Amino acid sequence: MREIVTLQLGQLSNYTATHFWNAQESYFTYSSDEKSLIDHNVHWRAGLGADGSETFLPRTVIYDLKGGFGSLRKINALYEAESESAPEALWSGQSVVHKQTPITPSEYQQSLDAGSEPAQLTTSNVRYWSDFSRVYFHPKSLNQLYDFELNSTTMPFERFSMGTELFSMLDREHDLADRDFRPFAEECDRMQGIQVFTTIDDAWGGFTSSYLESLRDDFPKTTIWTWGLQSPLLDISRAKRQLRLVNTAHSIEQLCTQSTTVVPLALPEEDMTTSVSMDRRSPWHTSALMAAAIETATLPSRLTQGSSEQAGSLDVLAESLNVNGNQPLASMRMSLAPAKDSPEDSRINVDFFQVGRVWSRQHVARLDTHKHVFGEILSYRDLDPLGHDNENGHLAPGERPIIGNSIVRKYDSALRFPLLDAYPQIYPQLAGNSDASLQTTLSTNSSIVQRIRTLRTESARLVPVNEREDLGNGLADLADAYQEGWFSGSDEDDDDL
Protein backbone atom coordinates (compact mmCIF):
# COMPACT_ATOMS: atom_id res chain seq x y z
CA MET A 1 0.00 0.00 0.00
CA ARG A 2 1.25 3.51 -0.81
CA GLU A 3 -1.56 5.73 0.37
CA ILE A 4 -1.88 9.49 -0.10
CA VAL A 5 -3.94 11.59 2.32
CA THR A 6 -5.41 14.74 0.78
CA LEU A 7 -6.09 18.07 2.50
CA GLN A 8 -8.54 20.53 0.90
CA LEU A 9 -8.75 24.05 2.31
CA GLY A 10 -11.04 26.74 0.93
CA GLN A 11 -13.62 27.27 -1.79
CA LEU A 12 -11.42 27.36 -4.93
CA SER A 13 -9.38 24.45 -3.56
CA ASN A 14 -12.53 22.39 -3.09
CA TYR A 15 -13.72 23.20 -6.60
CA THR A 16 -10.36 21.99 -7.94
CA ALA A 17 -10.31 18.90 -5.74
CA THR A 18 -13.88 18.04 -6.79
CA HIS A 19 -12.74 17.83 -10.42
CA PHE A 20 -9.83 15.69 -9.19
CA TRP A 21 -12.12 13.26 -7.32
CA ASN A 22 -14.58 13.07 -10.21
CA ALA A 23 -11.70 11.97 -12.43
CA GLN A 24 -10.60 9.34 -9.89
CA GLU A 25 -14.15 7.99 -9.68
CA SER A 26 -14.27 7.61 -13.47
CA TYR A 27 -11.27 5.24 -13.41
CA PHE A 28 -13.13 2.48 -11.55
CA THR A 29 -13.76 -0.64 -13.61
CA TYR A 30 -16.70 -2.95 -12.93
CA SER A 31 -15.87 -5.93 -15.12
CA SER A 32 -13.50 -8.76 -14.17
CA ASP A 33 -12.13 -8.66 -17.71
CA GLU A 34 -11.27 -4.96 -17.51
CA LYS A 35 -8.18 -4.08 -15.50
CA SER A 36 -7.66 -0.56 -14.21
CA LEU A 37 -4.36 1.22 -14.74
CA ILE A 38 -5.00 3.06 -11.46
CA ASP A 39 -4.26 1.69 -7.99
CA HIS A 40 -7.42 2.92 -6.26
CA ASN A 41 -6.06 2.15 -2.78
CA VAL A 42 -3.74 5.16 -3.11
CA HIS A 43 -6.55 7.73 -2.79
CA TRP A 44 -9.57 5.69 -1.62
CA ARG A 45 -10.28 4.04 1.72
CA ALA A 46 -12.43 1.00 2.45
CA GLY A 47 -15.01 1.19 5.23
CA LEU A 48 -18.46 0.16 6.39
CA GLY A 49 -21.66 2.16 6.03
CA ALA A 50 -24.38 2.51 8.65
CA ASP A 51 -26.12 -0.62 7.33
CA GLY A 52 -22.92 -2.68 7.34
CA SER A 53 -22.37 -2.43 3.60
CA GLU A 54 -18.85 -1.91 2.25
CA THR A 55 -17.88 1.60 1.17
CA PHE A 56 -14.93 2.99 -0.79
CA LEU A 57 -14.54 6.73 -0.23
CA PRO A 58 -11.87 9.41 -0.81
CA ARG A 59 -9.08 9.58 1.76
CA THR A 60 -9.39 13.33 2.25
CA VAL A 61 -9.95 16.03 4.88
CA ILE A 62 -12.03 18.99 3.69
CA TYR A 63 -12.31 22.46 5.24
CA ASP A 64 -14.54 25.29 4.11
CA LEU A 65 -16.29 28.30 5.59
CA LYS A 66 -19.88 28.49 6.78
CA GLY A 67 -22.11 28.04 3.74
CA GLY A 68 -19.27 26.72 1.60
CA PHE A 69 -20.54 23.15 1.38
CA GLY A 70 -23.78 24.06 -0.39
CA SER A 71 -26.34 21.25 -0.25
CA LEU A 72 -23.75 18.66 0.82
CA ARG A 73 -24.70 17.09 4.14
CA LYS A 74 -22.20 15.73 6.64
CA ILE A 75 -24.30 12.57 6.98
CA ASN A 76 -25.05 11.12 3.53
CA ALA A 77 -26.99 8.14 2.20
CA LEU A 78 -24.15 5.72 3.01
CA TYR A 79 -23.98 6.71 6.68
CA GLU A 80 -27.56 7.78 7.39
CA ALA A 81 -28.71 5.79 10.42
CA GLU A 82 -32.05 6.24 12.16
CA SER A 83 -31.74 9.02 14.69
CA GLU A 84 -32.50 8.20 18.29
CA SER A 85 -35.08 10.30 20.12
CA ALA A 86 -33.56 12.58 22.75
CA PRO A 87 -34.25 11.53 26.36
CA GLU A 88 -37.14 13.63 27.61
CA ALA A 89 -35.75 13.61 31.15
CA LEU A 90 -32.96 15.98 30.12
CA TRP A 91 -35.36 18.91 29.68
CA SER A 92 -38.95 19.16 30.84
CA GLY A 93 -39.66 22.60 29.40
CA GLN A 94 -40.86 23.60 25.98
CA SER A 95 -38.30 23.39 23.17
CA VAL A 96 -38.00 25.88 20.33
CA VAL A 97 -36.08 24.71 17.27
CA HIS A 98 -34.54 27.23 14.87
CA LYS A 99 -33.58 25.81 11.48
CA GLN A 100 -31.90 27.51 8.58
CA THR A 101 -33.57 26.82 5.25
CA PRO A 102 -31.53 24.03 3.63
CA ILE A 103 -29.91 24.66 0.26
CA THR A 104 -31.66 22.79 -2.53
CA PRO A 105 -29.44 20.26 -4.33
CA SER A 106 -28.60 21.14 -7.90
CA GLU A 107 -30.54 19.50 -10.73
CA TYR A 108 -27.36 17.59 -11.56
CA GLN A 109 -27.22 16.12 -8.05
CA GLN A 110 -30.92 15.31 -8.11
CA SER A 111 -30.52 13.43 -11.38
CA LEU A 112 -27.56 11.47 -9.96
CA ASP A 113 -29.61 10.53 -6.89
CA ALA A 114 -32.50 9.43 -9.10
CA GLY A 115 -30.23 7.43 -11.39
CA SER A 116 -31.46 9.34 -14.43
CA GLU A 117 -29.64 11.10 -17.24
CA PRO A 118 -27.46 13.82 -15.62
CA ALA A 119 -28.80 17.35 -16.02
CA GLN A 120 -26.72 19.84 -17.99
CA LEU A 121 -24.35 21.91 -15.86
CA THR A 122 -23.79 25.59 -16.62
CA THR A 123 -22.00 28.50 -14.96
CA SER A 124 -25.36 29.78 -13.73
CA ASN A 125 -26.50 26.59 -11.99
CA VAL A 126 -23.15 25.59 -10.44
CA ARG A 127 -23.33 27.57 -7.18
CA TYR A 128 -21.04 25.45 -4.98
CA TRP A 129 -18.42 22.77 -5.56
CA SER A 130 -20.85 20.17 -4.20
CA ASP A 131 -23.22 20.91 -7.11
CA PHE A 132 -21.07 18.89 -9.55
CA SER A 133 -19.47 16.34 -7.21
CA ARG A 134 -19.93 12.72 -8.29
CA VAL A 135 -18.60 11.08 -5.11
CA TYR A 136 -19.68 10.50 -1.52
CA PHE A 137 -17.44 11.59 1.36
CA HIS A 138 -17.02 10.08 4.80
CA PRO A 139 -18.64 12.27 7.51
CA LYS A 140 -15.22 12.69 9.15
CA SER A 141 -13.92 14.26 5.93
CA LEU A 142 -16.20 17.30 6.15
CA ASN A 143 -15.23 20.15 8.48
CA GLN A 144 -17.12 23.44 8.36
CA LEU A 145 -15.53 26.49 10.00
CA TYR A 146 -18.34 28.63 11.42
CA ASP A 147 -16.23 31.64 12.45
CA PHE A 148 -16.32 33.10 8.93
CA GLU A 149 -19.02 33.00 6.27
CA LEU A 150 -18.47 32.36 2.59
CA ASN A 151 -18.47 35.55 0.47
CA SER A 152 -19.07 37.77 3.50
CA THR A 153 -18.82 41.49 2.76
CA THR A 154 -18.69 42.54 6.42
CA MET A 155 -15.87 40.21 7.52
CA PRO A 156 -14.25 38.56 4.49
CA PHE A 157 -11.69 35.81 5.07
CA GLU A 158 -9.05 37.60 3.02
CA ARG A 159 -5.85 38.29 5.02
CA PHE A 160 -2.99 35.85 5.66
CA SER A 161 -2.92 36.81 9.36
CA MET A 162 -6.64 36.03 9.72
CA GLY A 163 -5.91 32.46 8.67
CA THR A 164 -3.07 31.98 11.14
CA GLU A 165 -5.16 33.47 13.95
CA LEU A 166 -8.18 31.29 13.15
CA PHE A 167 -6.06 28.14 13.10
CA SER A 168 -4.40 29.07 16.38
CA MET A 169 -7.79 29.62 18.05
CA LEU A 170 -9.36 26.40 16.74
CA ASP A 171 -6.24 24.34 17.38
CA ARG A 172 -6.19 25.38 21.04
CA GLU A 173 -9.73 24.07 21.40
CA HIS A 174 -9.57 20.89 19.33
CA ASP A 175 -6.01 20.08 18.11
CA LEU A 176 -7.18 20.02 14.49
CA ALA A 177 -4.47 17.77 13.06
CA ASP A 178 -5.05 15.18 15.77
CA ARG A 179 -8.84 15.32 15.53
CA ASP A 180 -9.29 15.56 11.75
CA PHE A 181 -6.12 14.35 10.01
CA ARG A 182 -4.64 11.65 12.23
CA PRO A 183 -7.56 9.16 11.89
CA PHE A 184 -6.98 9.02 8.12
CA ALA A 185 -3.19 8.80 8.46
CA GLU A 186 -3.36 5.98 11.01
CA GLU A 187 -5.43 3.87 8.59
CA CYS A 188 -2.54 3.85 6.11
CA ASP A 189 -0.19 0.88 5.93
CA ARG A 190 2.59 2.87 4.25
CA MET A 191 1.65 6.48 3.61
CA GLN A 192 3.26 7.76 0.43
CA GLY A 193 2.67 11.38 1.29
CA ILE A 194 0.22 14.23 1.80
CA GLN A 195 -1.40 16.19 -1.02
CA VAL A 196 -2.63 19.70 -0.17
CA PHE A 197 -5.04 21.90 -2.14
CA THR A 198 -5.08 25.48 -0.83
CA THR A 199 -5.40 29.04 -2.03
CA ILE A 200 -2.36 31.23 -1.34
CA ASP A 201 -3.73 34.71 -2.09
CA ASP A 202 -6.22 34.89 0.80
CA ALA A 203 -6.50 33.88 4.46
CA TRP A 204 -6.41 30.18 3.62
CA GLY A 205 -2.69 30.58 2.91
CA GLY A 206 -2.15 31.51 6.56
CA PHE A 207 -4.47 28.76 7.83
CA THR A 208 -2.67 26.14 5.71
CA SER A 209 0.80 27.35 6.71
CA SER A 210 -0.09 26.93 10.39
CA TYR A 211 -1.78 23.59 9.71
CA LEU A 212 1.30 22.17 7.95
CA GLU A 213 3.56 23.47 10.71
CA SER A 214 1.44 21.45 13.14
CA LEU A 215 1.56 18.38 10.88
CA ARG A 216 5.34 18.59 10.60
CA ASP A 217 5.64 18.00 14.35
CA ASP A 218 3.98 14.59 13.93
CA PHE A 219 5.12 13.75 10.38
CA PRO A 220 8.60 15.31 10.09
CA LYS A 221 9.80 13.18 7.17
CA THR A 222 6.55 12.76 5.24
CA THR A 223 6.48 14.08 1.68
CA ILE A 224 4.04 17.00 1.39
CA TRP A 225 2.95 18.32 -2.02
CA THR A 226 1.16 21.67 -1.85
CA TRP A 227 -0.84 23.02 -4.78
CA GLY A 228 -1.05 26.78 -4.19
CA LEU A 229 -4.04 28.10 -6.13
CA GLN A 230 -4.65 31.75 -7.00
CA SER A 231 -8.00 33.25 -7.99
CA PRO A 232 -8.29 35.29 -11.21
CA LEU A 233 -7.76 38.99 -10.49
CA LEU A 234 -10.68 40.13 -12.68
CA ASP A 235 -11.93 43.69 -12.05
CA ILE A 236 -10.80 44.19 -8.47
CA SER A 237 -9.47 47.34 -6.86
CA ARG A 238 -5.79 48.20 -6.59
CA ALA A 239 -5.95 47.70 -2.82
CA LYS A 240 -7.34 44.17 -3.29
CA ARG A 241 -4.61 43.34 -5.80
CA GLN A 242 -1.98 44.51 -3.35
CA LEU A 243 -3.55 42.48 -0.55
CA ARG A 244 -3.49 39.34 -2.69
CA LEU A 245 0.14 40.02 -3.59
CA VAL A 246 1.13 40.28 0.08
CA ASN A 247 -0.86 37.14 0.93
CA THR A 248 0.90 35.26 -1.87
CA ALA A 249 4.32 36.41 -0.68
CA HIS A 250 3.64 35.31 2.91
CA SER A 251 2.12 32.01 1.77
CA ILE A 252 4.98 31.05 -0.53
CA GLU A 253 7.61 31.99 2.04
CA GLN A 254 5.91 29.98 4.78
CA LEU A 255 4.67 26.99 2.78
CA CYS A 256 8.11 26.43 1.28
CA THR A 257 9.48 25.85 4.78
CA GLN A 258 6.81 23.24 5.60
CA SER A 259 6.24 21.49 2.26
CA THR A 260 8.49 19.21 0.25
CA THR A 261 7.17 20.73 -2.98
CA VAL A 262 5.05 23.84 -3.57
CA VAL A 263 3.49 24.48 -6.99
CA PRO A 264 1.68 27.84 -7.42
CA LEU A 265 -1.09 27.79 -10.04
CA ALA A 266 -2.83 30.82 -11.53
CA LEU A 267 -4.45 31.49 -14.89
CA PRO A 268 -2.42 33.70 -17.23
CA GLU A 269 -3.74 37.24 -17.45
CA GLU A 270 -3.29 37.13 -21.23
CA ASP A 271 -6.36 36.34 -23.30
CA MET A 272 -6.80 32.61 -23.96
CA THR A 273 -10.04 32.87 -25.94
CA THR A 274 -8.57 31.28 -29.08
CA SER A 275 -7.88 27.98 -27.32
CA VAL A 276 -9.96 28.07 -24.12
CA SER A 277 -13.56 29.27 -23.87
CA MET A 278 -13.66 30.19 -20.21
CA ASP A 279 -15.67 32.37 -17.86
CA ARG A 280 -13.04 33.59 -15.40
CA ARG A 281 -15.76 34.54 -12.93
CA SER A 282 -16.80 30.90 -12.65
CA PRO A 283 -14.66 28.84 -10.23
CA TRP A 284 -16.17 25.75 -11.89
CA HIS A 285 -14.40 26.81 -15.11
CA THR A 286 -11.11 28.10 -13.71
CA SER A 287 -10.63 25.15 -11.36
CA ALA A 288 -11.24 22.69 -14.20
CA LEU A 289 -8.15 23.89 -16.05
CA MET A 290 -5.96 23.66 -12.95
CA ALA A 291 -7.39 20.28 -11.94
CA ALA A 292 -6.49 18.76 -15.32
CA ALA A 293 -2.87 19.82 -14.81
CA ILE A 294 -2.67 18.60 -11.19
CA GLU A 295 -4.33 15.28 -11.97
CA THR A 296 -1.91 14.66 -14.84
CA ALA A 297 1.25 15.75 -13.02
CA THR A 298 0.56 13.37 -10.12
CA LEU A 299 -0.69 10.47 -12.26
CA PRO A 300 2.52 8.39 -11.80
CA SER A 301 1.94 8.33 -8.02
CA ARG A 302 -1.24 6.23 -8.39
CA LEU A 303 -0.51 4.03 -11.41
CA THR A 304 -0.64 0.30 -10.74
CA GLN A 305 2.82 -0.98 -9.94
CA GLY A 306 4.03 -3.90 -12.01
CA SER A 307 1.92 -2.93 -15.02
CA SER A 308 3.23 -1.62 -18.32
CA GLU A 309 2.68 1.91 -17.01
CA GLN A 310 5.53 3.88 -15.39
CA ALA A 311 4.53 4.16 -11.74
CA GLY A 312 6.24 6.70 -9.50
CA SER A 313 5.77 8.15 -6.03
CA LEU A 314 5.44 11.61 -4.50
CA ASP A 315 8.88 11.42 -2.89
CA VAL A 316 10.60 10.42 -6.15
CA LEU A 317 8.81 13.22 -8.00
CA ALA A 318 9.81 15.74 -5.32
CA GLU A 319 13.41 14.51 -5.30
CA SER A 320 13.60 14.97 -9.06
CA LEU A 321 12.63 18.64 -8.73
CA ASN A 322 14.42 19.57 -5.51
CA VAL A 323 17.82 18.63 -6.92
CA ASN A 324 19.95 20.72 -4.55
CA GLY A 325 17.83 20.11 -1.46
CA ASN A 326 16.66 23.72 -1.05
CA GLN A 327 14.37 24.15 -4.08
CA PRO A 328 10.82 23.35 -2.93
CA LEU A 329 9.15 25.83 -5.33
CA ALA A 330 8.31 24.50 -8.81
CA SER A 331 6.58 25.89 -11.89
CA MET A 332 3.89 24.13 -13.92
CA ARG A 333 2.94 24.16 -17.61
CA MET A 334 0.29 22.14 -19.44
CA SER A 335 -0.32 21.16 -23.05
CA LEU A 336 -3.68 19.66 -24.04
CA ALA A 337 -4.60 18.19 -27.43
CA PRO A 338 -7.40 16.28 -29.22
CA ALA A 339 -5.18 13.36 -30.29
CA LYS A 340 -1.87 11.68 -29.57
CA ASP A 341 -0.11 12.97 -32.69
CA SER A 342 -1.60 16.49 -32.64
CA PRO A 343 0.76 19.10 -34.13
CA GLU A 344 2.02 21.95 -31.98
CA ASP A 345 -0.34 24.57 -33.43
CA SER A 346 -3.40 22.53 -32.37
CA ARG A 347 -2.28 22.11 -28.76
CA ILE A 348 -3.62 24.24 -25.91
CA ASN A 349 -0.65 25.52 -23.90
CA VAL A 350 -1.01 27.10 -20.45
CA ASP A 351 1.72 28.44 -18.14
CA PHE A 352 0.37 28.39 -14.58
CA PHE A 353 3.40 30.02 -12.93
CA GLN A 354 2.23 33.64 -12.55
CA VAL A 355 3.92 34.52 -9.25
CA GLY A 356 4.52 38.19 -8.42
CA ARG A 357 3.31 40.47 -11.15
CA VAL A 358 1.80 40.04 -14.59
CA TRP A 359 4.41 38.75 -17.03
CA SER A 360 4.06 39.24 -20.76
CA ARG A 361 4.63 36.26 -23.01
CA GLN A 362 7.61 38.06 -24.52
CA HIS A 363 9.23 38.54 -21.11
CA VAL A 364 8.62 34.91 -20.16
CA ALA A 365 10.12 33.80 -23.47
CA ARG A 366 13.28 35.83 -22.74
CA LEU A 367 13.60 34.27 -19.28
CA ASP A 368 13.05 30.77 -20.69
CA THR A 369 15.70 31.25 -23.37
CA HIS A 370 18.50 31.66 -20.82
CA LYS A 371 17.22 29.49 -17.99
CA HIS A 372 19.14 26.64 -16.43
CA VAL A 373 16.99 23.61 -15.57
CA PHE A 374 17.72 21.97 -12.22
CA GLY A 375 14.91 19.41 -12.32
CA GLU A 376 12.04 18.68 -14.67
CA ILE A 377 9.21 16.14 -14.74
CA LEU A 378 7.34 15.54 -17.98
CA SER A 379 4.11 13.55 -17.73
CA TYR A 380 2.54 12.41 -21.01
CA ARG A 381 -0.98 11.02 -21.37
CA ASP A 382 -1.31 9.47 -24.81
CA LEU A 383 0.51 12.44 -26.33
CA ASP A 384 3.63 12.34 -28.48
CA PRO A 385 6.47 14.60 -27.24
CA LEU A 386 7.42 17.52 -29.45
CA GLY A 387 10.89 17.46 -30.95
CA HIS A 388 12.24 20.30 -28.77
CA ASP A 389 11.39 18.68 -25.42
CA ASN A 390 14.38 18.59 -23.08
CA GLU A 391 16.41 15.37 -23.39
CA ASN A 392 19.47 16.39 -21.36
CA GLY A 393 19.76 14.60 -18.05
CA HIS A 394 16.86 12.25 -18.76
CA LEU A 395 16.55 9.55 -16.08
CA ALA A 396 15.05 6.13 -16.64
CA PRO A 397 12.33 5.00 -14.19
CA GLY A 398 13.93 3.99 -10.90
CA GLU A 399 17.21 5.76 -11.65
CA ARG A 400 18.36 8.11 -8.87
CA PRO A 401 19.38 11.73 -9.59
CA ILE A 402 22.89 13.07 -9.00
CA ILE A 403 23.21 16.32 -7.05
CA GLY A 404 24.41 19.14 -9.26
CA ASN A 405 23.22 17.64 -12.55
CA SER A 406 20.13 18.67 -14.49
CA ILE A 407 17.48 16.02 -13.98
CA VAL A 408 14.69 15.24 -16.44
CA ARG A 409 12.20 12.49 -15.64
CA LYS A 410 9.57 11.38 -18.16
CA TYR A 411 6.43 9.39 -17.52
CA ASP A 412 4.21 8.01 -20.28
CA SER A 413 0.71 6.62 -19.85
CA ALA A 414 -1.96 5.50 -22.28
CA LEU A 415 -4.63 6.73 -19.85
CA ARG A 416 -6.22 9.85 -21.32
CA PHE A 417 -7.75 12.63 -19.23
CA PRO A 418 -11.54 12.12 -18.91
CA LEU A 419 -13.84 14.94 -20.03
CA LEU A 420 -16.86 14.05 -17.90
CA ASP A 421 -20.39 15.48 -17.91
CA ALA A 422 -19.39 17.32 -14.69
CA TYR A 423 -16.41 18.92 -16.46
CA PRO A 424 -17.14 22.20 -18.29
CA GLN A 425 -16.87 22.37 -22.07
CA ILE A 426 -14.08 24.94 -22.13
CA TYR A 427 -11.98 23.51 -24.98
CA PRO A 428 -13.55 24.36 -28.36
CA GLN A 429 -11.06 22.10 -30.17
CA LEU A 430 -12.23 19.11 -28.13
CA ALA A 431 -15.98 19.60 -28.54
CA GLY A 432 -17.67 16.20 -28.51
CA ASN A 433 -14.60 14.36 -27.17
CA SER A 434 -14.93 12.15 -24.09
CA ASP A 435 -11.25 12.46 -23.21
CA ALA A 436 -8.08 14.31 -24.15
CA SER A 437 -4.36 13.83 -24.62
CA LEU A 438 -2.35 15.82 -22.11
CA GLN A 439 1.17 16.73 -21.06
CA THR A 440 2.37 18.59 -17.98
CA THR A 441 5.82 19.94 -17.18
CA LEU A 442 6.92 20.54 -13.60
CA SER A 443 10.20 22.43 -13.41
CA THR A 444 12.71 23.99 -11.06
CA ASN A 445 14.89 26.38 -13.05
CA SER A 446 16.87 29.60 -12.83
CA SER A 447 14.02 31.77 -14.18
CA ILE A 448 12.38 31.44 -10.74
CA VAL A 449 15.10 33.71 -9.31
CA GLN A 450 13.76 36.84 -10.99
CA ARG A 451 10.15 35.90 -10.25
CA ILE A 452 10.75 35.59 -6.49
CA ARG A 453 12.95 38.68 -6.34
CA THR A 454 10.18 40.67 -8.02
CA LEU A 455 7.66 39.27 -5.55
CA ARG A 456 9.99 40.26 -2.72
CA THR A 457 10.44 43.81 -3.99
CA GLU A 458 6.75 44.42 -4.68
CA SER A 459 5.52 42.96 -1.40
CA ALA A 460 8.16 44.69 0.77
CA ARG A 461 6.65 48.14 0.31
CA LEU A 462 3.20 46.85 1.25
CA VAL A 463 3.89 44.99 4.52
CA PRO A 464 4.34 46.52 8.00
CA VAL A 465 7.92 47.31 9.00
CA ASN A 466 7.91 44.63 11.70
CA GLU A 467 7.17 41.93 9.07
CA ARG A 468 9.39 43.26 6.30
CA GLU A 469 12.74 41.85 7.37
CA ASP A 470 11.57 38.28 8.01
CA LEU A 471 9.53 38.14 4.81
CA GLY A 472 12.30 39.74 2.74
CA ASN A 473 15.00 37.44 4.09
CA GLY A 474 12.87 34.35 3.58
CA LEU A 475 12.10 35.20 -0.05
CA ALA A 476 15.73 36.20 -0.71
CA ASP A 477 16.97 32.84 0.56
CA LEU A 478 14.37 31.06 -1.56
CA ALA A 479 15.38 33.00 -4.70
CA ASP A 480 19.09 32.35 -4.16
CA ALA A 481 18.51 28.60 -4.29
CA TYR A 482 17.52 28.93 -7.97
CA GLN A 483 20.51 31.03 -9.03
CA GLU A 484 22.82 28.99 -11.21
CA GLY A 485 26.29 28.82 -9.66
CA TRP A 486 25.16 30.49 -6.41
CA PHE A 487 27.06 29.64 -3.26
CA SER A 488 26.63 30.80 0.35
CA GLY A 489 29.57 33.20 0.18
CA SER A 490 28.32 35.04 -2.89
CA ASP A 491 28.37 38.84 -2.69
CA GLU A 492 25.71 39.22 -5.40
CA ASP A 493 22.78 39.02 -3.02
CA ASP A 494 20.98 42.32 -2.61
CA ASP A 495 20.32 43.64 0.86
CA ASP A 496 17.97 46.47 0.02
CA LEU A 497 15.21 45.46 2.44
UniProtKB/Swiss-Prot annotation:
Keywords: Mitochondrion
Superkingdom of the source species: Eukaryota
Localization per record: Mitochondrion
Gene3D superfamilies registered for this protein in UniProt: Tubulin/FtsZ, GTPase domain
Keyword Mitochondrion listed: yes
CDD domains: misato (cd06060)
Keyword Mitochondrion carried by entry: yes
Gene Ontology cellular component terms for the protein in this record: mitochondrion
GO biological process, one term: mitochondrion organization
Function: Involved in the partitioning of the mitochondrial organelle and mitochondrial DNA (mtDNA) inheritance.
UniProt similarity note: Belongs to the misato family.
Protein's name according to its UniProt entry: Protein DML1
Gene label: DML1
